[in-house]
């Protein structure tokens, strides 16, 4: 199955998905040294986003969140890619300065943690390759 959205980036990426059904703040919500979700309100608290394709509905919080995303990337703890239903400026800027491929305007209800997907930002496509841990 392929989902269509809008993409930022040029690199086709394949990997395991980690899905949050709640908005995410990178400032105070993710540890930039470990890549672990620290937000006590998050449905994926304690999980690592390192090397995974991070899926969430939208960002929230401070503009500093863009720099936390950059720090995650510089520390080798960032996500491999981001899929977000609604990409607001914080997440968009963070993905751009970090070189993290991003797909937005996608119905994330079709995605579940553990799925394997391929994203093609130039085409704005998310292709589900394997169902994973349902």
UniProtKB/Swiss-Prot annotation:
- InterPro entries noted in UniProt: PMDh-S-like, PMDh-S-like_dom, PMDh_S
GO terms for molecular function, please? hydro-lyase activity
Enzyme Commission number(s) of this protein: 4.2.1.182
- Nucleotide-binding in keyword set: no
Q: Does the keyword Ribonucleoprotein apply?
A: no
Instruction: Name the source's superkingdom.
Output: Archaea
Enzyme class at the top of the EC tree = lyase
Q: Which reaction does it catalyse?
A: (R)-5-phosphomevalonate = (2E)-3-methyl-5-phosphooxypent-2-enoate + H2O
One GO biological process this protein is involved in is: isopentenyl diphosphate biosynthetic process, mevalonate pathway
Metabolic or biological pathway, per its Swiss-Prot or TrEMBL entry? Isoprenoid biosynthesis; isopentenyl diphosphate biosynthesis via mevalonate pathway
Q: Which CDD domains match?
A: AcnX_swivel (cd01356)
Q: Which family does it belong to?
A: Belongs to the AcnX type II small subunit family.
Report the protein's function: Component of a hydro-lyase that catalyzes the dehydration of mevalonate 5-phosphate (MVA5P) to form trans-anhydromevalonate 5-phosphate (tAHMP). Involved in the archaeal mevalonate (MVA) pathway, which provides fundamental precursors for isoprenoid biosynthesis, such as isopentenyl diphosphate (IPP) and dimethylallyl diphosphate (DMAPP).
Subunit note: Heterodimer composed of a large subunit (PMDh-L) and a small subunit (PMDh-S).
Q: What is this protein called?
A: Phosphomevalonate dehydratase small subunit
